[in-house]
């Protein structure tokens, strides 16, 4: 299994895999010493252990709790926005700045070419998404994927540019939330997010939004209004993180597992509620185990939906998008 970071629920699997690797090393040693009898016994033991490993892997990843999916969504080796852009598209040209204050590195975006050779599909699209870092230095540079007002204003500028040139918009969402600092509030964080919701609802080109990791609160919905909303199988999308919910309701972070269950924040939950449209299947073990395969799956789904959305008139797109989001939730008059 790829990756060096081991989550707590993965430890039994990694221990078995380590034992399996030790046996394979012993087998190679037996082969050099030409001890055929020992080698045959090791072959049988390895085959049995491989079956146990496969069974345990399926047992773990096919029965993940909501909190465990939150942990996978935060896996530090999981593909981020730029990873998907470079794996799914070509000729990406990053565009910077909101033309008001500065360039927010927590959100990246630009034009790219989305192609599928099998079907002959080829389309220039505007790619926009949250970007996290891989280590402390890059996370500080990217502000841990927490966008400031200028990040959302940059995203809106790029969406308007895409609308001007009649190009579809694809947003990739992966954030623990919008940056909550005083300076962000002073520069109009709430207004910037609200403005994006208003403008995205009536943008005249197709919009597809994909939650690829964390989808926390207004930070996520700020680039999350689309004709189609996808969620990666092991991502989460909620008004609040399980830890914050736990600290509010129980005055402690120790109840984050219960909070995750109560929030119903997984892709399966949100598909049942009609909040999202499709789930992007992940390789067994998470997107980080086979990032190229994950990107290929997502690309196929994007192409399929873009074919449908690009055949619709602009007024139909806007009307259906507004109706889609207006129909969410339950209320009493």
From Swiss-Prot:
UniProt enzyme class: transferase
GO-annotated cellular components: acetyl-CoA carboxylase complex
Pfam families (alphabetical): ACCA
Major subcellular location class: cytoplasm
Leader peptide range in chain numbering: none
Catalyzed chemical reaction(s): N(6)-carboxybiotinyl-L-lysyl-[protein] + acetyl-CoA = N(6)-biotinyl-L-lysyl-[protein] + malonyl-CoA
GO biological process: fatty acid biosynthetic process; malonyl-CoA biosynthetic process
Pathway(s) served: Lipid metabolism; malonyl-CoA biosynthesis; malonyl-CoA from acetyl-CoA: step 1/1
Segments forming domain CoA carboxyltransferase C-terminal: 48-308
Family: Belongs to the AccA family.
Described function: Component of the acetyl coenzyme A carboxylase (ACC) complex. First, biotin carboxylase catalyzes the carboxylation of biotin on its carrier protein (BCCP) and then the CO(2) group is transferred by the carboxyltransferase to acetyl-CoA to form malonyl-CoA.
Subunit structure: Acetyl-CoA carboxylase is a heterohexamer composed of biotin carboxyl carrier protein (AccB), biotin carboxylase (AccC) and two subunits each of ACCase subunit alpha (AccA) and ACCase subunit beta (AccD).
Protein name, UniProt field: Acetyl-coenzyme A carboxylase carboxyl transferase subunit alpha
Organism field: Chlorobium limicola (strain DSM 245 / NBRC 103803 / 6330)
Encoding gene (name): accA
């Amino acid at each position: 299994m790829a990756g060096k970071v081991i989550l707590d629920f993965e430890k039994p699997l990694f221990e078995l895999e380590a034992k399996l690797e030790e046996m394979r090393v012993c087998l190679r040693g037996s082969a050099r010493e030409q001890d055929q009898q020992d080698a045959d016994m090791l072959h049988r033991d390895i085959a049995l252990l491989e079956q146990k490993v496969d069974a345990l892997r399926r047992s773990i990843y096919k029965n993940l709790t909501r909190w465990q999916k939150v942990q996978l969504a935060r896996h530090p080796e999981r593909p981020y926005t730029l990873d998907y852009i470079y794996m799914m598209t070509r000729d990406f040209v990053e565009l910077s700045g909101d033309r008001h204050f500065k360039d927010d590195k927590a959100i990246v975006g630009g034009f790219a070419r989305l192609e599928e050779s099998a079907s002959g599909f080829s389309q220039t699209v505007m790619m926009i998404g949250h970007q996290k870092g891989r280590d402390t230095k890059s996370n500080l540079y990217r502000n841990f994927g927490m966008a400031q007002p200028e990040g959302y204003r940059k995203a809106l500028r790029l969406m308007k540019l895409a609308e001007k040139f009649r190009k579809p918009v694809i947003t990739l969402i992966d954030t623990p939330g919008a940056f909550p600092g005083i300076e962000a509030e002073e520069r109009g964080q709430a207004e910037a997010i609200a403005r994006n919701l208003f403008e995205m609802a009536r943008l005249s080109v197709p919009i597809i939004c994909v939650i690829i990791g964390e989808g926390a609160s207004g930070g996520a919905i700020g680039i999350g209004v689309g004709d189609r909303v996808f969620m990666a199988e092991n991502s989460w999308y909620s008004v609040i993180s399980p830890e914050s919910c736990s600290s509010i309701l129980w005055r402690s972070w120790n109840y984050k597992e219960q909070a995750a269950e109560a929030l119903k924040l997984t892709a399966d939950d949100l598909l049942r509620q009609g909040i999202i449209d499709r789930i992007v299947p992940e390789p067994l073990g998470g997107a980080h185990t086979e990032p190229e395969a994950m990107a290929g799956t997502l690309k196929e789904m994007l192409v399929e939906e873009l074919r449908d959305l690009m055949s619709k008139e602009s007024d139909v797109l806007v009307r259906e998008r507004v109706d889609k989001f207006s129909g969410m939730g339950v209320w009493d008059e």
